[in-house]
Amino acid sequence: MRVLAAMGLALLLGACATGQAVRTSANTMIVQTSAAAVCGGQGALAASQRLTAIETIRAGYDRYVITGGEAQNNVRVSQLPGSYNTEGTYGRGSYQATTTYQPGPTIVSGSHDQGLAIVMFHEGEPGAQQAVGAREVLGPDWEEKVKKGVNFCF
């Protein structure tokens, strides 16, 4: 039981998301992220939003609008074979036995994937007033997050 708890804690602490961005024109980009199964779809979306803000700033823009998105759940759960244990007693001409089944551990694998299409704006450009501020998304320590890059661990 302690081993399973330790494995669960290790998975939770090692829950990471990675991402990449591809410029499709001077002011548009496609951002894709993949988050560990334990992060869920919300973790993948949060990673996409952070990556979008980071890449918007790196591209020299201030704000962005998400114009399209897609998500995919590739998480699978498998169970390893279990084991049977039979214990019995014999005495006075009778036999009594009890068989118990211990299920095998479950293995969670796969990822939650997220893709976003964005249009980026400079401050003051037409359409920028409706766009999300990249620095606002990242918070007060946005410079450090832009420097750190696209690999996140939650």
Over which residues does each language-model region extend?
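Sec-dependent signal peptide recognition
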Residues: 1-10
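C-terminal motif of bacterial Sec signal peptides marking the signal peptidase cleavage site
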Residues: 12-15
